[in-house]
């Protein structure tokens, strides 16, 4: 009798069910009974771990965790909707609130809207739309796409939360076929009509140079096309206002004959630059800086030096055997150092020039005290030359132009 009353564990398999690994029976696609759900929550409140609840009730650990997680989040133990879609959460009231939030703060995020709906009690945890649903509502219902109507009014797509209010007061924008130029102007884009008195006069002036015409003295050849100009405003017509406006427009485009000739020469040049024509870039006004009177002294010096270097007698002064004998100061002009050109005096004689003699002083002046400063009077005897005959030459280079160090004889004695 008991055997007949005991439920067959395999009978659930015939009803699209089965037995889990813990031995519990379940039906595929059907939620867990409310009694088991309530028992799971009660055991969780008693402090039983989810793994122990799973063993006691023979319910899979995933099912226990899912039920407890939903209970902790929403406070409900009801199962989800079986079949079909979820109940519609984008009610007109919710959509209006979302649109109002976006108008108040266009930069509000979807999750902020969701939290505000819950905080203000517009929706509860079961009916609040998800973040993706809020984004879809904003994209499809709050921001309407542009649909022009036959009367020219329509709504445009703007930034999130901003809507365009259709205005029937402004007339429709004229088509590009009627006014191809005006349709791209500001008035054409905004649909503002232009009255006859405010109609702008446009002069399209094409200025080009004809070389043959310029050479003949005709100046510039002007071709103008007047558009949207009232009748009688042609330059050769009777209206003086059109002529004055065109004259003011062309006044800045006139050139003198010299400017036209300069332009003609520039355009006749080849396309590629030439290194030999670099001198042409110097302005004619800069030629006064290099006048002949200013260059005459320099040219005279160059001429004298060239004539001195061209003297054939200089060849005899150069030593051909490359020997370097010790010579006196008077014969240094006839010697040549290796790797250096021969010294050529400006006067062509074997003597020092006047500028060189100016840097020389007689050797007798060095016989006195080398140091006259009080701090160095004690060193006069130590730094004095032991043999004054070394300074007996007629001329000796001074210390100022040479910049040499003290004599080495003073260091040899220490």
Swiss-Prot record:
Q: Which GO biological-process labels does this protein carry?
A: brain morphogenesis; branching involved in ureteric bud morphogenesis; camera-type eye development; cell fate determination; cellular response to glucose stimulus; cellular response to mechanical stimulus; cellular response to retinoic acid; central nervous system development
Q: Phosphothreonine is carried by which residues? A: 225
Q: Which InterPro entries match?
A: Homeodomain-like_sf, PAIRED_DNA-bd_dom, Paired_dom, Pax2_C, PAX_fam, WH-like_DNA-bd_sf
Q: Where in the cell is it found?
A: Nucleus
User: Which CDD domains does this entry report, sorted A to Z?
Assistant: PAX
Q: Which UniProt keywords apply?
A: Developmental protein, Differentiation, DNA-binding, Nucleus, Paired box, Phosphoprotein, Transcription, Transcription regulation
What is known about the tissue distribution of this protein?
Answer: Kidney and nephrogenic rests.
For the region RED subdomain, give the residue spans: 93-141
| The keyword Cytoplasm is annotated on this UniProt entry | no
Region of interest (PAI subdomain), residue spans: 18-74
Q: Which residues bind DNA?
A: 15-141
A Pfam family recorded for this sequence: PAX
Q: Spell out the molecular function terms from Gene Ontology.
A: C2H2 zinc finger domain binding; cis-regulatory region sequence-specific DNA binding; DNA binding; DNA-binding transcription factor activity; DNA-binding transcription factor activity, RNA polymerase II-specific; RNA polymerase II cis-regulatory region sequence-specific DNA binding; transcription cis-regulatory region binding
Query: In its keyword annotation, does this UniProt entry include Nuclease?
Result: no
Cellular component per GO? centriolar satellite; microtubule organizing center; nucleoplasm; nucleus; protein-containing complex; protein-DNA complex; transcription regulator complex
What the protein does comes down to: Transcription factor that may have a role in kidney cell differentiation.
- Description of how the protein assembles with itself and partners: Interacts with ELGN3; the interaction targets PAX2 for destruction. Interacts with TLE4.
**Entry's disease:** Defects in Pax2 are a cause of developmental defects of the kidney, brain, ear and eye.
* Official protein name in the record: Paired box protein Pax-2
Q: Which organism is it from?
A: Mus musculus (Mouse)
**Organism lineage:** Eukaryota, Metazoa, Chordata, Craniata, Vertebrata
Q: Which gene encodes it?
A: Pax2
């Amino acid at each position: 009798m008991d055997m007949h009353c005991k439920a067959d564990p395999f009978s659930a398999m015939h009803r699209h069910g089965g037995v889990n690994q813990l031995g519990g029976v379940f039906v595929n696609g059907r939620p867990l009974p409310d009694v088991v759900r309530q028992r799971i929550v009660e055991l969780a409140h008693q402090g039983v771990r989810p793994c122990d609840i799973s063993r006691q009730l023979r319910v899979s650990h995933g099912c226990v965790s899912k039920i407890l997680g939903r209970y902790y989040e929403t406070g409900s133990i009801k199962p989800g909707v079986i079949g079909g879609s979820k109940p519609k959460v984008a009610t007109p009231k919710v959509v209006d609130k979302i649109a109002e939030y976006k108008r108040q703060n266009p930069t509000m995020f979807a999750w902020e809207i969701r939290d505000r709906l819950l905080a203000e009690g517009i929706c509860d945890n079961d009916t609040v739309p998800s973040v993706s649903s809020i984004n879809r509502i904003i994209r499809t219902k709050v921001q309407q796409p542009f649909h022009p109507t036959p009367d020219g009014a329509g709504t445009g797509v703007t930034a999130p939360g901003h809507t365009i209010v259709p205005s029937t007061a402004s007339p429709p924008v004229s088509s590009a076929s009627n006014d191809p130029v005006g349709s791209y102007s500001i008035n054409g884009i905004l649909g503002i009509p232009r009255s006859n008195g405010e109609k702008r006069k446009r002069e399209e002036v094409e200025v080009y140079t004809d070389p043959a015409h310029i050479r003949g003295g005709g100046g510039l050849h002007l071709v103008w096309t007047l558009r949207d100009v009232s009748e009688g405003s042609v330059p050769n017509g009777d209206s003086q206002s059109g002529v004055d406006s065109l004259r003011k427009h062309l006044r800045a485009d006139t050139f003198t004959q010299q400017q036209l000739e300069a332009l003609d020469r520039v355009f006749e040049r080849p396309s590629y630059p030439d290194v030999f024509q670099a001198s042409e870039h110097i302005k004619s006004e800069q030629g006064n800086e290099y006048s002949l009177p200013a260059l005459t002294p320099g040219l005279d010096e160059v001429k004298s030096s060239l004539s001195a270097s061209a003297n054939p007698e200089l060849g005899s002064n150069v030593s051909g055997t490359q020997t370097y004998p010790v010579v006196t100061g008077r014969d240094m002009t006839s010697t040549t150092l290796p790797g250096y050109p021969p010294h050529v005096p400006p006067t062509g004689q074997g003597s020092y020039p006047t500028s060189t003699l100016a840097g020389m002083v007689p050797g007798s002046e060095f016989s006195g005290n080398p140091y006259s400063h009080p701090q160095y009077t004690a060193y006069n005897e130590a730094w004095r030359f032991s043999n004054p005959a070394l300074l007996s030459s007629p001329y000796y280079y001074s210390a100022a132009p040479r910049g040499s160090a003290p004599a080495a004889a003073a260091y040899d004695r220490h």
